[in-house]
Regions:
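M16/insulysin-pitrilysin zinc metalloprotease superfamily fold
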Residues: 342-343, 349, 357-372, 380-385, ...
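Structural motif
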Residues: 8, 317-318, 340-349, 387-390, ...
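Basic, nucleic-acid-interacting segments
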Residues: 1-303, 320, 341-345
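Core structural elements
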Residues: 196-208, 276, 313-337, 346-363, ...
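Strongly charged, low-complexity linkers/loops
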Residues: 369-379, 383, 389-460
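Residue-level detector of well-ordered alpha-helical segments, enriched
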Residues: 322, 335, 345-353, 377, ...
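Amphipathic alpha-helical core segments of compact helical bundles
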Residues: 23, 238, 333, 354-362, ...
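C-terminal non-catalytic interaction appendages of large macromolecular assemblies
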Residues: 150-155, 193-200, 209-212, 418-481
């Protein structure tokens, strides 16, 4: 049974806990550095290893990042907050507890708008709080040994917790993609999932359709790709549906995603909710921020993707799909806005940026870089086509030359065989019609589809340098005579 069939009888209740590793120069509570590719246990210090007598210090850069995120999601930013110890035992947690936040997080509430099935949904947040990351365990089943790399231990994280308002696995995937987009826009994390910088825990329960009652919740831990977020939740929904249809009870459980088997597998059954025995960290005093400090940080938050999307749909009349492509990164959005600011039609700008320019970057398999084709050069190119100085096809060749050579557009237009101003279109059309008398007679007798044949013949003569509109207009006029 597929997800949509299950959804006819059951409501899906999904909440996410997303961990984003912040791009700070040092760890959350020490001056120790963290970089992904360093050799194991080469970036550690007494604090990140939990050695006796080592005292933590709060990373100010992490606090600034959290304030920016709070502003981006319209959450309540607390001037006063505390850190707490979250106790659990695992080899990658050397202190026996994690420094996190409990009843006084830095960010409360807020929401994140997403698009799903071409409708806007606001995903409400419970909170976002700062904490330190754990180390990383490596299990070798052949040697029956486990190793731990403590380089990541103590790295700065922001954990984003949603309300249980996500109603479909695909929504969960889209929400996680939006979080990555937001943290990229505000420049607090590159959120590279392949490096573990964006991870997700998913809480799932099923409720009888329309009952409004929560079912028994299970949790899938450490999902590390957008595709797997959706697949893991779907797998757990299918499992819970089977249990409930067999008139059995779902048990509280912690699961992990097995990518090889394409299924979420139970790690352990929980009889009760986890008791982490939170209490305020005695080594970290309460933090109190000045209002002016918070306001300064908030003022640095740029225009966000959902702001661009609404503006472009309302003011530029672009489609949702166009807007989502153009807002996919801050650099692309700013580039598009710059092109439009040069008095280029938003529709034309959208087509050239999201279709033609993107094609060139995709061919090179490189990220968008506005310096490859400057906005002012793209404006000149679009204007040349608008004035029928060059054809759209020639424009694509000019764009490629700009992209590949970095030359000035004026130089490319002069050196290339693009200009159609010296072509006598009327003379060429007369020649084509003179050579195709039989086709002209057939056209005049009602075979109007032959217009395509004539256009093709003219384009052969002009090598496609004359605009389609001019060719059609001239041909239509001549064929009426």
């Amino acid at each position: 049974m597929n997800i949509n069939d299950i959804n006819k009888n059951w409501d899906f209740i999904i909440g996410l806990e997303i961990h984003v590793q912040l791009d700070c120069n040092s760890k959350m509570f020490s001056n120790c550095q963290y970089e992904y590719d360093n050799s194991p246990n080469s970036l550690t210090c007494p604090t990140s290893l939990g050695l006796p007598g080592a005292l933590p210090n709060v990373n100010q850069s992490a606090i600034e990042s959290a304030i920016m995120f709070g502003k981006a999601v319209n959450g309540k930013i607390s001037k006063n907050f505390t850190f707490a110890r979250k106790h659990y035992f695992y080899p990658d947690l050397p202190k026996g507890y994690q420094i996190s936040q409990f009843d006084q997080p830095i960010i409360s509430g807020g929401s994140v708008p997403i698009w799903w099935n071409e409708k806007e949904f606001k995903i409400d947040l419970t909170r976002a709080h700062l904490e330190e990351d754990a180390g990383k365990s490596f299990h070798n089943n052949d040697s029956k040994k486990s190793n731990v790399d403590y380089n990541r231990s103590g790295a700065a994280l922001i954990e984003i917790v949603t309300e249980p308002v996500i109603v479909h696995p695909e929504q969960a995937k889209i929400f996680m993609q939006r979080i990555k987009q937001i943290v990229n826009y505000i420049n607090i994390s590159n959120a590279e999932m392949e490096k573990g910088k964006l991870r997700c825990d998913a809480n799932i329960s099923l409720s009888k359709k329309g009952s409004g009652k929560f079912g028994v919740k299970t949790e899938i831990k450490n999902i590390n790709s957008f595709r797997n977020v959706q697949k893991a939740i779907e797998s757990e929904i299918i499992r819970q549906n089977k249990i409930l249809n067999d008139r059995k009870e779902v048990q509280q459980a912690t699961l992990t995603w097995n990518n090889d088997k394409n299924v979420a597998e139970i790690m352990r059954i929980k009889e009760n909710a986890d008791d982490y025995r939170y209490f305020p960290d005695p080594d970290l005093p309460p933090v109190s921020l000045e209002k002016s400090f918070i306001e300064d940080i908030k003022s640095s938050v740029p225009i966000l993707p959902f702001d661009y999307e609404k503006k472009w749909m309302n003011e530029y009349n672009l489609s949702l799909n166009e807007c989502m492509i153009l807002s996919s990164s801050k650099d692309i959005a700013k580039y598009f806005e710059e092109v439009v600011s040069l008095d280029v039609s938003p529709k034309k700008a959208s087509t050239w940026v999201s279709t033609e320019l993107f094609r060139l970057f995709n061919e090179m398999n490189t990220a968008f870089d506005s310096s490859k084709v400057e906005a002012k050069d793209l404006k000149i190119l679009i204007d040349e086509i608008k004035r029928n100085k060059i054809t759209p096809n020639s424009g694509k060749e000019v764009l490629r030359a700009l992209f590949e050579t970095g030359k000035n557009i004026s130089e490319i237009l002069k050196s290339g065989d693009f200009d159609s101003s010296d072509i006598n279109t009327t003379e060429i059309i007369d020649k084509v019609l003179s050579n195709c008398q039989n086709e002209v007679l057939r056209y005049k007798k009602g075979e109007e589809k032959l217009i395509g044949f004539f256009i093709g013949q003219v384009n052969k003569e002009t090598k496609g340098k004359v605009s389609h509109e001019i060719v059609i207009a001239e041909l239509s006029k001549k064929l009426k005579d």
